[in-house]
Structures are given as structure tokens and as C-alpha cells.
């Protein structure tokens, strides 16, 4: 089991990062927020989880212990595998997950791609008592935390290839192309930062805004 890595970030995309440790490059999957916080060319220390299947071995990287525990705990729910658990955490933070389960908030759980009404209800029941200590259960204001969505700005100047990358990433997570495209345009229309977003910034903001 590979529980953690310390090394240099030598490559990364919207949903993966490659960390070189003692001359060996480890490619890890992770949420957009986690990947974005790992600076290319710098040394990082991350916690990881290796998921072994009959036809694959995938190393997942996490930004903190809460995210790693949420990833493992989500998979205790029937119908939730590693890929869906990561998709859920791409949209819902561990703290939001804890709050939604505590309040029986099925609507928040259904924000994640691949989580319908029945699965949301099952998650609320099966996770009861298992996720309450995942950070502080409090309102976090995800869109505001992104620090970029406001009353409008220069977001529409984003390069076409950035739009395409983010669209592909959202579709890969399980969102329909229509919903992904609509969300991207909505985020860009409200972008208030001085500069147009890069792919990571636009993806994080879109995940925070998608419903």
C-alpha cells in the first residue's frame, strides 16, 4: 500500500498529477481542487490511496486527511466505487458531505454526477454517524471561496482550448455536455477576476457552481 508520497510535481492536468520520488514518477488521480493546489516544479507531500482492481491499479491523491477518509468512507455505500467517490468529492467537500448527511439533505448529495435520488437516500442512511467528524460542519460558501465569481468581468476572454478542456473534464466526471456547457458559460459571465481563468480555475469554479 502506498500511503503517501514526497517528491517533485513534474506534470499535471485537470484530473491527474505526476510526482517524481527518487527517480520514479507516480501518476495519481485527484479532484480538480487537490490537483490545482500542487505547484508544478515544487516538492510536495501528499497522502494517497492505492485502489487495485482486476484490470487496473490507480493511485489517488488527496489534499488532506478529511478528503482521504471521505473517499474511503463513501465506498462503504453499495453502488459507490472509487471513481464515483472521487466524482462526488469533486463537487462536494468532505465538510459539505458531513453536513448533508447530518441534515438528510438529499438535494446536495444529488449535485454529484452519478448520484440519483435512490443513491442519495442510501448515502444519507449508510453514512450516518460515519462522516460527522469530517472537519467542521458549517456553511462554507463554495462559490465565494473560489474568489472569482462576482458581478461580471473579463471571463468571456478565456481561450477556446480552456473551455474545451474544462468541458471534457466535466463530461468525464459524468455531467451531460449540455449541463457542463451551460455551467461554464454561466461562470464566465460572472467572472470578476482581472484576468481570464486558466483551465484549473475555471474547472474549480464550474464544479462549485454546477447543480
UniProtKB/Swiss-Prot annotation:
Keywords: Cytoplasm, DNA damage, DNA recombination, DNA repair, DNA-binding. It is found in: Cytoplasm. InterPro entries: DNA_helicase_Holl-junc_RuvA_I, NA-bd_OB-fold, RuvA, RuvA_2-like, RuvA_C, RuvA_C_sf. It comes from the Bacteria. Residues 64-142 are annotated as: Domain II. Pfam families: HHH_5, RuvA_C, RuvA_N. Residues 158-211 are annotated as: Domain III. GO terms for cellular component: cytoplasm; Holliday junction helicase complex; Holliday junction resolvase complex. Residues 143-157 are annotated as: Flexible linker. Residues 1-63 are annotated as: Domain I. Transmembrane segments: none annotated. GO terms for molecular function: ATP binding; four-way junction DNA binding; four-way junction helicase activity. GO terms for biological process: DNA recombination; DNA repair. Belongs to the RuvA family. Has three domains with a flexible linker between the domains II and III and assumes an 'L' shape. Domain III is highly mobile and contacts RuvB. The RuvA-RuvB-RuvC complex processes Holliday junction (HJ) DNA during genetic recombination and DNA repair, while the RuvA-RuvB complex plays an important role in the rescue of blocked DNA replication forks via replication fork reversal (RFR). RuvA specifically binds to HJ cruciform DNA, conferring on it an open structure. The RuvB hexamer acts as an ATP-dependent pump, pulling dsDNA into and through the RuvAB complex. HJ branch migration allows RuvC to scan DNA until it finds its consensus sequence, where it cleaves and resolves the cruciform DNA. Homotetramer. Forms an RuvA(8)-RuvB(12)-Holliday junction (HJ) complex. HJ DNA is sandwiched between 2 RuvA tetramers; dsDNA enters through RuvA and exits via RuvB. An RuvB hexamer assembles on each DNA strand where it exits the tetramer. Each RuvB hexamer is contacted by two RuvA subunits (via domain III) on 2 adjacent RuvB subunits; this complex drives branch migration. In the full resolvosome a probable DNA-RuvA(4)-RuvB(12)-RuvC(2) complex forms which resolves the HJ. This is Holliday junction branch migration complex subunit RuvA. The gene is ruvA.
Amino acid at each position: 500500500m502506498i500511503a503517501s508520497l514526497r517528491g517533485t510535481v513534474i506534470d499535471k492536468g485537470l484530473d491527474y498529477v505526476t510526482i517524481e520520488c527518487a527517480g520514479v514518477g507516480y501518476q495519481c488521480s485527484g479532484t480538480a481542487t487537490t490537483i490545482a493546489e500542487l505547484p508544478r516544479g515544487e516538492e510536495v507531500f501528499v497522502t494517497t490511496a492505492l485502489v487495485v482492481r482486476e484490470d487496473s491499479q490507480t493511485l489517488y491523491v488527496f489534499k488532506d486527511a478529511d478528503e482521504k477518509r471521505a473517499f474511503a468512507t463513501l465506498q462503504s455505500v453499495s453502488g459507490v466505487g472509487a471513481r464515483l467517490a472521487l466524482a462526488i468529492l469533486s463537487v462536494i467537500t468532505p465538510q459539505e458531505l458531513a453536513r448533508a448527511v447530518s441534515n438528510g439533505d438529499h438535494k446536495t448529495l444529488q449535485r454529484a454526477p452519478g448520484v440519483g435520488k435512490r443513491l442519495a437516500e442510501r448515502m444519507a442512511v449508510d453514512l450516518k454517524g460515519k462522516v460527522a467528524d469530517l472537519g467542521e460542519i458549517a456553511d462554507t460558501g463554495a462559490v465565494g471561496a473560489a474568489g472569482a465569481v462576482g458581478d461580471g468581468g473579463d471571463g468571456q476572454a478565456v481561450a477556446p482550448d480552456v473551455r474545451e478542456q474544462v468541458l471534457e473534464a466535466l463530461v468525464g466526471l459524468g455531467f451531460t455536455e449540455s449541463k457542463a456547457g451551460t455551467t461554464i458559460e454561466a461562470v464566465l459571465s460572472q467572472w470578476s477576476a482581472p484576468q481570464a481563468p486558466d483551465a484549473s480555475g475555471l474547472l474549480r469554479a464550474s464544479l462549485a457552481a454546477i447543480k
